[in-house]
């Protein structure tokens, strides 16, 4: 067992008041994750809760279609919860098999003048550290894009090492 994180991730989740959502189904012709050796590559996750997209639009845009920084950070956290929900079956239901979070890739649908993509993706990064401790610290990209699938404001993909 990797001593860099809790011996019991389920207990850590419970202590944090987190209930993992059901893993969202794929929206197109791809699989939710692929395992190669000890690495698990998880497809990009949108801020979906109970099959519904919770955050739509461009971050930093004004008007009714605009998404605030705070809303986007919350959406990134939901994406991270969905990543972990996809990871759990790759670990045969045992998240204690996670050795480390290797990398997150975050995409933020951004207004042309919005440049705080790293702050948005911190919503996902912070959650990984909260859950996995030091093993949750990871390499990362935070990229601004014009649009994302289904009009989502945020998408996060992940790479994890398991034993």
Predicted regions and their residues:
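Short, polar/acidic, helix-capping and beta-turn segments at strand->helix junctions
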Residues: 2-163
